[in-house]
Amino acid sequence: MKEDFLHLLWKQQLHTRQNARLADGSSLTILKTGYRNSNSGPDFEQAKIVIEELEWVGSVEIHVRASEWYDHEHQSDPAYQSVILHVVWEKDADVFRLDGTVVPTLELKDKIPLEVLLRYRELMNPAPKSIACESFLHSVPAIRMTGMQERVLTERLERKAREILKRWFLNGKDWQETFYQTLAHTLGLKINAEPMLMLAQSIPVKIFASLGWNEEKVFSLLLGQAGFLEEESIGESNIAMRTEYLFLAHKYQLESHLLAWKKFRIRPGSFPVHRVLILASMVHKLPDWFRLLTENDAQPSSFFSTGPFQPSPVLEGFLHETSPFKGKITWRPFLKDSLIINFLSPFLTAIGLEKENPDYIEKALDWLSAVRSEPNSVTRLWTSFGFECNTAATSQALNELYTGYCLSRRCMDCSLGSYFLGRGS
């Protein structure tokens, strides 16, 4: 038995309520279960109950065993003086408030319908199952599934946004620096995200600004600092780039880092050198990107409207040697979608949270709804159960639902699990 199950039993009133009695035999009528408290203190606040015709308003605390009241030292905590009811699975002790008065106890172990317990056991069954509630997913009302998707999509965006805000704070609340570093981290994918971030951190964005965002200097700095202009690895056509890098590295006193690039078992388009080239082509236009992000009427297409990146003669040789680019960096559809999903939308959300402006968050949600879904094993699993997955908003939500709830069996926190437990009761 877990406490989160008892929380759900209380919140949805899934226990037997007719002629309800407390552990001491007193009559109990529940008028309001109260509001879940996500901070310290009792589990539910502003509950309203009637005990032996006397109305009480206050807090409700929930434990598996009554003795946990003492394990958590609630008897000496003033915050629990307001508790009017102790809801437990098993009453193994009497409990008292700070002032010495007894706390009424509702014991649930003999008050739960058998069908509710069987459904709970099915959800918590340790047998391997892709989704614990898969046997009844077909019966979930569409409005409930939609509501859960909207909730977890917001949770996913906000979680990513808070990571960006941590970086923003470490960068002295510099949005442009944070934009640049987050872009690099995103382009590195999971396999090279950290080396890409370290690369960006080793060349502050103010250096590019002082160089007027010059195309050749941006490429030389990033490729050289990444270790891709070493003498033994470049041809004669790229010596000019190395010379430029060495001059700029000395001028700005850049510290060299041995970046641990992972190169094995990855697709050519994900090779570190290719990802650094993409980063350089975007840093070259970074001021425009950042300005577009904060414009009210900006659309995702605005960021990729410039067409293929056209290299200068100095860069042509290098690009020619780094297949599959062969002289140009194009905005491939999957790259556009990936940047909108994993970079632009979370960054918009971060700005919205920091400025307390929901318009940015709404824009992020709209952009995700305008992008195609990304196919993966999780989205294929959900579609096998009959759920449509046509946009990135849906695929991101279903990924979050699976990884954040299904895998960790957070069924009691999920509206699908609570529907399963409560149906017909």
Language model regions located:
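Intrinsically disordered, low-complexity linker/loop segments enriched in Gly/Pro
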Residues: 127-170
